[in-house]
Amino acid sequence: MAFSRLSFAASLIVFSSLIISSVAYYGNEADPETGKLIPIAVEGIIKCKSGGKTYPIQGATARIACVKVDAYGNELVPISILSSKTDAKGYFIATIFPSQLRAGRTVTKCKTYLYKSPLADCDFPTDVNKGVRGQPLSTYRILQDKSFKLYWAGPFFYTSEPTYY
C-alpha cells in the first residue's frame, strides 16, 4: 500500500513537471555573464514528397508564431515572423530578438508552421511533423558563444497532391 502511494506521488511530480515545461517561456533566459536576454532561433528543413521521391525545396519559407506575455504573465497579441528562404538543402532559420519585443515582455507557446513553397508542382502543405497545425518548440541548445537558444523544427513536407485532414 505504501509503495503504491509512493509511486502515485512520484508519478504526480513527474507529470506536473511535464506540464510546467510544456508552457515554457522562450527568449527570456538571460546570459549569466552579461545579464542580457538571449534571442531564440529556429532552424529546420522543408522538403517535397512527390510519389516515392523526397527532395529539399529551395526558396520555401516557414512561419513561427508565438504569444507575447507581459511582465505580469498576461498573454497579449501574438507575434509572427517568417524564416529566411530555404537554401538548396531545404534548410531555413528564423530568429526572434528581445529587441523585437517591448521591455518586460517575453514570448511563449511558440509553434512553427509551413508557410510557402515556390514550387507549383509541390505546393500542398502536409501535416507531417505538424507542419499545418504547428509544431511546438520544445528542446533547444544554447550555442557555444551564448548568442542564441537554438530550436529545431521539422522536417516539414509539401506534396504535389492535396491532403485533407
From Swiss-Prot:
An individual GO BP term: seed development
UniProt note: phenotype after gene disruption: No visible phenotype under normal conditions. Short and abnormally shaped root hairs due to the suppression of cell growth and cell death, and withered seeds, both having a tendency to necrotize and thick cell walls with abnormal structure in phosphate (Pi) deficient conditions or after ethylene treatment. Production of dark brown shrunken seeds unable to germinate, especially in low humidity.
Record-level GO cellular component terms: extracellular region; plant-type cell wall
Family, as annotated: Belongs to the plant proline-rich protein superfamily.
UniProt keyword list: Cell wall, Developmental protein, Ethylene signaling pathway, Secreted, Signal, Stress response
Primary site of residence: secreted
Native source organism of the sequence: Arabidopsis thaliana (Mouse-ear cress)
Localisation per UniProt entry: Secreted, Cell wall
Signal peptide: 1-24
Segments traversing the membrane: none
Statement: the UniProt record of this protein carries the keyword Secreted: yes
Tissue: Root hair and seed specific expression. Also observed in other tissues including siliques, roots and flowers.
Its job: Contributes to cell wall structure in root hairs and seeds, especially in phosphate (Pi) deprivation conditions or in the presence of ethylene. Particularly important in maternal tissues (pericarps and seed coats) during seed development, especially under stress conditions. Confers thermotolerance in seed germination rate.
Entry protein name: Protein SEED AND ROOT HAIR PROTECTIVE PROTEIN
Source organism superkingdom: Eukaryota
Induction data: Accumulates in root hairs within five days under phosphate (Pi) deficient conditions (at protein level).
